[in-house]
Structures are given as structure tokens and as C-alpha cells.
Amino acid sequence: MRNKIFIITIMLALATLVCSGQSFLSKFPKLTKKNLSEFFSDWEAYSDSIVSRVVKNDSLIDMVVAYNYLPMQLEGRTCLPGKEAPPKYHVVPQYIEVERYYLDVDTTVFSPRFGFPYHCSELKDNEYRIDSIIPQLPYRGLYLTSDISETLSTFVGGRRNGDKIEKINKGNLKILKKYIPVDYGHWGGYWWFTSFPLITNICYADNLIAVKIRTSWWTGEETWYIKKDDEFVRREEPTGKWIE
């Protein structure tokens, strides 16, 4: 009887893993040009399955994310204006980290050009919380995870290995760009497989929401929503612009 219970438990655990993880990656121990199309079909199916199970419980943050990802919701917009041969898919991280601060921050003392005012005194456990949300999937969208990114990086090469950087597989890189955006990090050894603008983090205080955005693989800014009369109002001009 115990053996049967153990077997059933293992089967349930495996079923949960298959349903919730990127189980399709096990089909592709080595990504090649021949199986790349199938890989993207499975990746798209995985992303759609995540969308179908997402529980939305923070309408304000969802609205903020949707507004900043609006360009990717428009049919046919899979690249920045001016680029030729846009890729087939948009790619966004599966999770966006949200830092929640249960207090007001001083938006006067801390000038907007310095970005979100992190210089708070030591906070108690009940004054902040860090969690994450799954953003809305854009038009022709795919969710990127660290495992999927690793698979793609192996396919195109150019990764850092100690003090050396692997040779880039230019043939694989060319075909991959037909499917998704691909940018090489300017320090070398890593890739960006995401669409831009890209939300990297959200800081949510009682009177301020700061959305940290990468506008490209080498530039970024923050968008502020300041609370006025019990409503968060978007500041038209971005704050805290930076260049790497």
C-alpha cells in the first residue's frame, strides 16, 4: 500500500512539473536549424498555457504594465520603427518583480531625475514586500525564462566562459533574428532576447509607482505615477534616464 501511495505521489509531482515548467525544453537537448521551427511552436504553446492559468489580482499594476507595453499590443508591430524584416514574435520576461512599500515617499526632496527614492531608513518587515507578477502576453508574444534564454544562448554562441568568449554562430544568429529580437550585450558574453521597451522592475509606494524600463539593450528610464486625489497620475516626462 505504501509503495502504491509513493508511486501515485511521484506521478502527481511529475504531472505538476510538466504542467507548470518549461517541459518542452526536454525535447530539444540541442537546438538546431532543423528543429528551430518546432521549438518556437512549442514555446508559443507554453506561453499560451501560462496565460490561461494566470490569476489577476492587482488591477492597478496590470493597467500600468499594459500601458507601457501598448506598442507591442498593436498587430504587426514586432520591432521598432525603421527596422527591416521585423521578427515574428515579441518576447517579454515571464515575471516582473514588484517592490511594494507600505509608506509615502518624498517626491519633492528626491528629484525625479535621480529616479525612485530608495534612500529610505531601515524598513520593518511590515513596511515592504517583494513579489512578482506575470504580465499580459503581447500580440504574437512569448514568455522568456532563464532556461529558455540559456537554450537560445547555446544556439547562437558568443557566451563568456571564464576569460574567453565563445565564437558567435553567425548562421544560427541570422535565422534566430527572423523569429525574435536579438541583441548582443555591449560588454560581450551575453544576449538580449527581449523586445523593447522592457519593464524590468516596479516600485510601488503608497503615493508613487515607479516603473523601471529599458528602452533598448543599452538605455533606460523610469516612468512615474504620482498619487493625486486618490488616483495615480502618470507623469508625461520620463525620469531617471540612463545610458550604459
Go through the PLM ranges and name each one.
Residues 223-243:
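Short beta-strand edge/turn micro-motifs at domain boundaries
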Residues 22-208:
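Flexible low-complexity loop/turn motifs enriched in small/helix-breaking residues
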Residues 5-7, 14, 62, 86, ...:
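Intrinsically disordered, low-complexity segments enriched in glycine/proline and serine/threonine
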Residues 194-197, 217-222, 236-237:
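Short, surface-exposed coil-to-beta transition loops
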Residues 208-214:
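Short beta-strand elements that form the blades of beta-propeller/WD-repeat-like
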Residues 203, 214-220, 242-244:
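His-enriched metal-coordination microenvironments in redox/metal-binding proteins
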Residues 1-32:
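Bacterial Sec-dependent N-terminal signal peptides
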